[in-house]
């Protein structure tokens, strides 16, 4: 018996000595499935970025700090922001709303395609990609190394959005201090769309259109052709809002807070106020690319001036 205890002691001691920290700090795959009526919506995480608080306008630094402290969102790296996309499965076809940044914003983003496959889907089976607008963190994910990531998909953007970024005449309307950023964005957009334009798989839509059951909603301001998409099923509604909001803390508590990269700040703020009021009043679901992953939830009206983001409750199995 004594020999047994000695042997066990040696074994346990060996286990203690050989223990090592995990080699990777990577989290679990970034996808979450949500059953919305007859549709299965899979949130896909592209990654996380940090925005400089100075990018948010109409609030003093003291006011920003107060709100961020209230929501335990103070971070020396900046204001944490998710980049999400949403895959909608109607049982017959797959529609992707926005596509992430691929490599356009560096290595911290670019996981949409990988997470889509980890969720059990195939890139070749995506038939439609709806783009709320053409900023790189929404369009770059459709291509990689000059090739289509979704080889059988048709890409859609609003006609005004396409005109603003792809019509050479639009450059003349851009202020001189913004022209460099504008031209850099145009370069990324053209590179992303090129493999689809080559096979005539890039199309534009207009106000009032319905694409694969998605109703087009005019939410311009962030960009001239920014649009959201509404889907209805079994008495419920969900709105894929795009970039009407970039911070779950600042812009719900103070919705008149703009961001520096809104093309038309006043219009973007008015759009946000209108959409927050409508979404909260009708208790619509929201799917948002820049709210904390999985980016699905509701908007609650606190008072005449403030709102609150209510994320969905995590469920370890799909409810039918």
Regions found by a protein language model. Name each.
Residues 20-27:
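Cleaved targeting-peptide boundary
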Residues 21, 110, 117-121, 125, ...:
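Metallo-beta-lactamase
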